[in-house]
Amino acid sequence: AGDVITQVNGTEITGSSDLVSLVSEAAIGNTVTLFMAVSLGFTTVLVAAVRPLVGLIGVPAEAVPGTVQYLTICFIGIPFITAYNIISSVFRGLGDSKSPMYFIAVACAANIALDILFIGPMALGPVGAALGTTLSQTLSVIVALFGIRRHKTGLRLSRQNFRPRKGVLGRILKIGLPVAVQDGCIQVAFIIITIIANHRGLIDSAAVGIVEKIISAMFIVPSSMLATVSALSSQNLGAGKPERAAQTLKYAAMIATGYGIAVVLVIELVAEPLLGCFTTDAAVVLMGCQYIRGYIVDTIFAGIHFSFTGYFAACGKSYIGFLHNIIAIVLVRVPGSYLASRLFAGTLLPMGLAAPAGSLLSVMICVAAYRWMKRRGTLYTAA
């Protein structure tokens, strides 16, 4: 939702004398209608199908009850994730990329604090982890709502704006469908990797699960680069300043790389105590440290290809982001994780390295596509 409406609004309202046009209001209203309906539908279906899904992913028998509780709570939180993304995308589409960053910071800090509280002193286990995620998302929505009330956006949304319009929904889906399918494929890849880890036993499964929670927090900055670059680049392209859009990509990639290197260094130093915040099982901590020390390198490369994906979406070429992710998943991430799991039964480090290897391939594809289209003069062709 966030990337779709950010790009639609950014290209339509920037460069005009009136910041908010009727078209952008219709885009916002139709986005709310579309994505909230989809999120409620997904919530209903997933909560109803949670037990079959747990059986499908091969969760160890002793972990099934906790997994069912965890997923049920997380599925209930889907509408809150959607609401947060919609509100943040409105800010980005209007040129304010700082406010969503603050909302993300609140969610990140709350998630970490609540996870430590619920899983540590309160010993709630999987339920605590799920509550930490869902409550932090809810808090970010509340903060975002306060933010949008205080921010003078100039929006005048009426009931008409929320009524589905074929033309508006068509543009939203044209831009957003490749991004949505791309994200869906990434999540499917994560599920497959989780299944691979589950078949290695309870210790490895628990280690991978904890690391995924930590990685999700560490990835807030790299993943936000997609929407940020998309918003700023689309605004500059809409204002007829493609050179500034290219500079946005350049500096975003530099920031993402710097952040990734810093995170890698920190994790290398504090992996053991960090994992120890989530479990007292020495075996889980050991395997988790191996996995995260490989996986964390992905923060460097992922931030770069997220930046390129946002830039390509602003240029009306969101299909490139879809293609490079599919190629990386099919050729590297999933087969790499599977082979590492089979060939290195005593360590999770090689399995963790499959993720950054896939992202490195994505970066190579993005750079090649950028240079090729720039030479041909086709970068800024409208979608």
Regions from the PLM with identified roles:
Residues 1-36:
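C-terminal recognition in membrane/secretory proteostasis and scaffolding
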Residues 37-77, 121-177, 233-298, 341-383:
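Short alpha-helical transmembrane segments in multi-pass integral membrane proteins
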Residues 37-44, 81-100, 194, 207-265, ...:
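Small-residue-rich hydrophobic transmembrane alpha-helices
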Residues 41, 45, 75, 79-80, ...:
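Residue-level hotspots within pore-lining transmembrane alpha-helices
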Residues 50-53, 114, 188-201, 229, ...:
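Hydrophobic/aromatic end-of-helix segments at the C-terminal termini of transmembrane alpha-helices
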Residues 73, 107, 136-140, 144, ...:
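Transmembrane helical elements of multi-pass membrane transporters/channels
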Residues 73-92, 100-108, 129-142, 223-226, ...:
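Short runs within selected transmembrane alpha-helices of multi-pass transporters and secretion channels
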